[in-house]
Design a protein with these regions (language model features):
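Conserved catalytic cores of soluble enzyme domains
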Residues: 1-112, 116, 120
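C-terminal alpha-helix plus adjacent terminal tail
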Residues: 114-152
C-alpha cells in the first residue's frame, strides 16, 4: 500500500465516477500524482502551468545524471500548456489575466462552459465511454518500419 496503489485507485475511481470530471492544473503537476488528473472528461491548464509525469529536475537527473540541466529537460518534455494543447493532451488553456479577480472570473467562465458541454451528453454511459476512450488514447503511437517507412 504505497503511492503506486494510491495513484491506481485514483485512476480507477475517476474512470468510473458517474459525474462530469474536470481537472485544472494550476501550477506544476508532476510525477505519478499528476497522472491521476488525466482521467477527466476535460483537462485544462492555466496558461503558465506545467504538467508532466516527471519533474524536469528528476528527468535531468535520470537522463543526464545532472539536475542542473532541468531547463533543457523541460524543453524536451514539452510540459507547457501550449505544448500539451497542441498535442491534444489537454482540452483548453485558461488565461490568467493580470489580477487574481480576473483569473477567478476566467476559471469560473471556463468551468461553466465546460460543464454545459458535458451536460449536453445524451447519458452518463456515453460520457463514461468517452472518458475511457480519451484516457486510452494517451500515449498511442505507431512503429515505423525503417526500410519501407510504412506503419507496422
Amino acid at each position: 500500500r504505497g503511492q503506486g496503489e494510491a495513484i491506481a485507485r485514483c485512476l480507477y475511481e475517476f474512470i468510473e465516477l458517474k459525474t462530469p470530471v474536470i481537472s485544472i492544473v494550476t501550477g506544476e503537476g508532476g510525477s505519478g500524482g499528476a497522472l491521476a488528473l488525466a482521467v477527466a472528461d476535460r483537462v485544462l491548464m492555466l496558461e503558465n502551468a506545467l504538467y508532466s509525469v516527471i519533474s524536469p529536475r528528476g528527468c535531468a537527473s535520470i537522463l543526464w545524471k545532472d539536475p542542473k540541466r532541468e531547463a533543457e529537460a523541460a524543453d524536451t518534455l514539452h510540459i507547457t500548456a501550449q505544448d500539451l494543447y497542441s498535442f491534444g493532451m489537454i482540452e483548453g488553456i485558461i488565461q490568467e489575466g493580470t489580477s487574481s479577480a480576473q483569473l477567478i472570473r476566467n476559471v469560473a467562465r471556463t468551468l461553466r462552459d465546460q460543464l454545459a458541454e458535458l451536460d449536453a451528453e445524451p447519458d452518463i454511459d456515453t460520457m463514461l465511454q468517452k472518458r475511457y476512450e480519451k484516457f486510452r488514447r494517451v500515449g498511442v503511437f505507431r512503429t515505423i518500419n525503417q526500410e519501407s517507412n510504412e506503419g507496422v
